[in-house]
Amino acid sequence: MITLVLLFTAFNADDSQAILQAEKQWMAAIQKADGPALEKLLHIQLIYGHSTGITDSKASYIGKVSSGKQKYAGVEQEIIKTQFIGDTALVHAKMHMWGINQNGKFDDRLMLMQTWLKRDGRWQLVAHQTAKLAQ
């Protein structure tokens, strides 16, 4: 019984580190406008909800970022909580994102909820939603 608990804890620690790494890779990819990296990180059924109410699919979001229509000059993240439910991980965080998009410059402080799904041994982002915080 004790052995099983220790193995379960180690498994969760590995997944926790993998999710933190996936979050860092996502932030780096959007700042670098790295379409190929986003292609690997984002799930085919991605729902990407912006704080403006606009929703993107995987293809439309990669298109915006790769073309420069959604350009991130900076991204900072403070993770509040991660939670695992089987092969699903939830990440709740505070974000500061700034850059330029089709509406002009943005400098947003946000609450973020991301859902990651583990498939074939790797984590992919399947849902993203932000809400603006009071400045």
Regions found by a protein language model. Name each.
Residues I30, L41, Q45-D56, S66-K71, ...:
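A short gly/proline-enriched turn/hairpin at secondary-structure junctions
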Residues I62-Q102:
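Surface-exposed, charged secondary-structure patches
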Residues I2-I44, F84:
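Short, low-complexity N-terminal intrinsically disordered segments enriched in polar/charged residues
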Residues W26, L38, L46, Y61, ...:
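Hydrophobic pocket/interface hotspot
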Residues T52-G53, Q102-K105:
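Short, solvent-exposed loop/turn segments at secondary-structure boundaries
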Residues L42, T52, E76, M95-M97, ...:
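A mature extracytoplasmic/lumenal domain signature
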Residues R109-A134:
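Short beta-strand edge/turn micro-motifs at domain boundaries
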